[in-house]
């Protein structure tokens, strides 16, 4: 096998790993967005009568846009209606929209940093060595967790015991 073919195989593996990381980050981002939007419900349909004062404290309407304050949450809710007599309106809670936008930007920054970190070239040998080191640490801790005392009893190592890690 020539040096060029080995470099091509290594580059193909790097591209494959980067594509998998990109797809995983996109899927996680979409799941996060769906969860946040489902939790906060920033935009939802409101079924109203023509009497807005029955549902909201302060109401003022300009054209077909009505801004109201909810009785229960005292959050600013903007209601968009087709006209003043429409029954189904669209309510937007701008506080929740702001929270969602900030969380999405934070997630995009974090995922971009994660993608840049994973984009660095990591060989398969480095991954195998790191996995072996982690497995050795785990085995070493498990083997040293229990010991037999002078009387043959099986004991768990505690702080203060001889040889406690």
Curated annotation (Swiss-Prot):
Any Gene Ontology CC annotation: membrane
Subcellular location: Membrane
Glycosylation site positions: 51
Membrane topology listed for this record: Multi-pass membrane protein
Top-rank taxon, per record: Viruses
Broad class of the protein's primary localization: membrane
Keyword line: Glycoprotein, Membrane, Transmembrane, Transmembrane helix
Transmembrane portions of the chain: 20-40, 97-117
The protein's name: Uncharacterized protein R119
Organism encoding this protein: Acanthamoeba polyphaga mimivirus
Lineage of producing organism: Viruses, Varidnaviria, Bamfordvirae, Nucleocytoviricota, Megaviricetes
């Amino acid at each position: 096998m020539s040096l060029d073919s080995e470099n091509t195989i290594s580059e193909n593996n790097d591209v494959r790993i980067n594509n998998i990381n990109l797809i995983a980050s996109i899927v996680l981002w979409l799941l996060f967005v769906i969860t946040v939007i489902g939790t906060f419900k920033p935009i939802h349909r409101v079924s109203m009568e023509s009497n807005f004062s029955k549902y909201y404290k302060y109401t003022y309407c300009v054209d077909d846009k009505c801004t109201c304050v909810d009785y229960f949450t005292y959050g600013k809710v903007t209601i968009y209606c087709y006209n003043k007599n429409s029954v189904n309106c669209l309510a937007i809670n701008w506080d929740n929209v702001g929270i969602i936008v900030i969380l999405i930007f934070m997630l995009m920054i974090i995922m971009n940093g994660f993608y840049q970190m994973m984009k660095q070239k990591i060989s398969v040998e480095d991954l195998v060595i790191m996995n072996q080191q982690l497995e050795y640490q785990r085995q070493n801790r498990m083997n040293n967790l229990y010991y037999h005392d002078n009387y043959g009893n099986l004991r768990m190592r505690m702080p203060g015991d001889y040889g406690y890690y």
